[in-house]
């Protein structure tokens, strides 16, 4: 990995991993998009987006998982930069660098988080102050998960990702994210899904502890886990391995996979679990970080 030394006038934004603690598929629209009900939080695991003043627009990528991406014109980072510049009437001038650490096509919104971080970074670099509702609308044009990543805090996500409402306050907890380094494209998972649809079951109570949060989550599910496990059976091994770790309160897949998470009450247990897992499954990607909740403030225009 090439070392990156940001210039003094650069802007740096973290693109944190999105974690679906629950995910219910509640319907399918005529255009093929699915309606969801999902409790979304974030993890401290992140990519880093650096924006520097420049003439013209460019993107360089480095980091452990950067080789899995390309910097072509359709990259979500470049699309986000151009959309923001167009919306704000600003020249798209910036030198962008992405330090890519999160796994790709992994169910934790890595690309969407990168796009959202680009919007935040360039708003600061270019001194643009669009209303939040307008920023969220712009984010939705880039992808279904970009608005929630732009908010970056705990929300209940409904519709196709365009209806966001604040989640109830969540307790302190830690997430151990694990990916077996297998990409699972989201369209394949939805295509493989069988059966009917689920009723929405949003979290309305505020759990007093990580244990209480785990119990509340056990009364809910991730409807995409079953089809994802059929596509990539190694997900079953990831879930079994997480569930067997001391202190793991819940093991579940995030999003459309293949990343899974273990929920822990404290950092010591999560760090011990990560160390144990790296000894037994050294080829897997793993990261233990604090659950980022901090109930989001969402404009009424984006609320259900």
From Swiss-Prot:
GO terms for molecular function: 4-(cytidine 5'-diphospho)-2-C-methyl-D-erythritol kinase activity; ATP binding. The active site is at residues 18, 145. GO terms for biological process: isopentenyl diphosphate biosynthetic process, methylerythritol 4-phosphate pathway; terpenoid biosynthetic process. ATP binds at residues 103-113. It comes from the Bacteria. Keywords: ATP-binding, Isoprene biosynthesis, Kinase, Nucleotide-binding, Transferase. Its EC number is 2.7.1.148. Pathway: Isoprenoid biosynthesis; isopentenyl diphosphate biosynthesis via DXP pathway; isopentenyl diphosphate from 1-deoxy-D-xylulose 5-phosphate: step 3/6. Coiled coil: none annotated. It catalyses: 4-CDP-2-C-methyl-D-erythritol + ATP = 4-CDP-2-C-methyl-D-erythritol 2-phosphate + ADP + H(+). Gene3D superfamilies: 3.30.230.10, GHMP kinase, C-terminal domain. Belongs to the GHMP kinase family. IspE subfamily. PANTHER family: 4-DIPHOSPHOCYTIDYL-2-C-METHYL-D-ERYTHRITOL KINASE, CHLOROPLASTIC. Catalyzes the phosphorylation of the position 2 hydroxy group of 4-diphosphocytidyl-2C-methyl-D-erythritol. This is 4-diphosphocytidyl-2-C-methyl-D-erythritol kinase. It comes from Rhodospirillum rubrum (strain ATCC 11170 / ATH 1.1.1 / DSM 467 / LMG 4362 / NCIMB 8255 / S1). The gene is ispE.
């Amino acid at each position: 990995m090439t070392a990156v030394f940001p210039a003094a006038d650069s802007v740096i934004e973290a693109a944190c991993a999105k974690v679906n603690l629950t995910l219910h598929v509640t319907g399918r629209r005529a255009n093929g998009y699915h309606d969801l009900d999902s409790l979304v939080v974030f993890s401290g695991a992140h990519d880093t987006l650096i924006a520097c003043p420049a003439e013209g627009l460019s993107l360089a990528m480095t980091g452990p998982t950067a080789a899995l991406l390309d910097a072509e014109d359709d990259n979500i980072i470049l699309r986000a930069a151009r959309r923001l510049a167009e919306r704000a009437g600003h020249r798209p001038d910036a030198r962008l660098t992405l330090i890519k650490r999160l796994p790709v096509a992994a169910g934790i919104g890595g690309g969407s988080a990168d796009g959202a971080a680009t919007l935040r970074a360039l708003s600061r670099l270019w001194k643009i102050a669009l209303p939040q509702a307008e920023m969220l609308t712009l984010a939705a044009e880039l992808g279904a998960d970009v608005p929630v990543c732009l908010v970056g805090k705990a929300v209940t996500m409904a519709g196709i990702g365009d209806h966001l409402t604040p989640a109830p306050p969540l307790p302190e907890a830690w997430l151990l994210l694990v990916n077996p380094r297998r990409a699972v494209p989201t369209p394949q998972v939805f295509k493989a899904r069988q059966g009917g649809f689920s009723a929405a079951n949003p979290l309305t109570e505020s759990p007093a502890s990580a244990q209480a949060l785990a119990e509340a989550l056990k009364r809910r599910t991730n409807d995409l886990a079953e089809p994802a496990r059929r596509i990539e059976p190694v997900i079953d091994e990831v879930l079994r391995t997480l569930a067997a770790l001391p202190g793991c309160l819940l093991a579940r897949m995030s999003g459309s996979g293949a990343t899974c998470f273990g929920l822990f009450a404290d950092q010591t247990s999560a760090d011990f679990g990560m160390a144990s897992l790296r000894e037994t499954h050294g080829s897997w990607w793993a990261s233990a970080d604090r659950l980022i909740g901090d109930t989001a403030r969402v404009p009424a225009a984006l609320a259900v």
